[in-house]
Amino acid sequence: MSWIEPEVTKKPRRPMFLCVLSNTKTAHIPKLSAAGKTAELTDYTPAGDAELMDTGNIISVPVLPMTPPYDTPTPAIMTRSALKLTDAPYNFINSGLIVTPEVPCIDLKAKPGEDIRKPVAVYDVQGVYERAKFLGKRLRNQVDHVVIGESIPGGTTTAMGVLMALGYNGNVSSSADENPLKLKKQVIEEGLKASGLTFGCLKDDPMKAIACMGDPMMPAVIGLVAGFQSTDVSIVLAGGTQMAAVYALIKHLGFNTEKLAIATTRYVVEDKSANFIELTRILGVPAVYVADPGFGKSELKGLHRYETGTIKEGAGAGGAMYLAGLYGISQDEFRSEVENVCKLLKAGH
């Protein structure tokens, strides 16, 4: 049995991995995001993820991005491992960071996202979209297959907010053991009220849904997709419910979605507090790839925490594993490399 389902057989000639790095002040709401030891430290998570993915360690951030209470290491360890094993080209894209990493980033000149309980959550949505589209057009002649991931703490809450504004009622996943759905719903209700919105009222205005309830990662990914669209490039959105929300936005914008797929981890799919697969069916996602790193067989306790639901996805981990599968890398090879990355970081023990 393959560790990527459905099994991928056709290796692309010119793949590329992109990771959009963003912040939303929605993550500052206590107990909402577990993508960092404290709500304040979530500001550093995307920068730390980028430094880790690029160099194998953190450089400028004060602490390795981890999830309490067991200090489970960030999913960026999986992305780092896949990029190292495949040697695939990659780029990081700054779309509204509070803290910028000490590694090269393409800057879309986006502002960090505001708390969605404010009337405006994302400023200059159209401008960010256009700049990302221009970037996609610049890159499209270099690739035939692109995997786009994200790192944004609080992103599952903004995803749920956007989905509700578009008319989709569903629970989203979480980076925590216990999904704080009650808190998320309360925050979203307050956000809808602050913007004068009701369920499904923005189904014909997806850009406004981002401006009111979203985060700056969303217009960046949508713009990239638009930039790649007019060519034969296959696009994989790497993520769980956040990329399902991005797909919904793309669909409501009227884009062609035939060459789009989503790749995520087994941990998102098996999250009983969410309904990821049902949501992708409702949205009509053409293909969903599910990666299983097999961390239950690992000697590291921190990796075992993934098996129990602590952290499920992030930093494009599912898509990066999908990419590793395309290169013919086995689950055992991949897990061994993740353990090596953790040992160098002294994480996950």
Swiss-Prot record:
<dbReference type="InterPro" id="IPR003200">
    <property type="entry name" value="Nict_dMeBzImd_PRibTrfase"/>
</dbReference>
<comment type="similarity">
    <text>Belongs to the UPF0284 family.</text>
</comment>
<protein>
    <recommendedName>
        <fullName>UPF0284 protein Mbar_A0178</fullName>
    </recommendedName>
</protein>
<dbReference type="InterPro" id="IPR036087">
    <property type="entry name" value="Nict_dMeBzImd_PRibTrfase_sf"/>
</dbReference>
<dbReference type="InterPro" id="IPR002805">
    <property type="entry name" value="Nict_dMeBzImd_PRibTrfase_arc"/>
</dbReference>
<dbReference type="GO" id="GO:0008939">
    <property type="term" value="F:nicotinate-nucleotide-dimethylbenzimidazole phosphoribosyltransferase activity"/>
</dbReference>
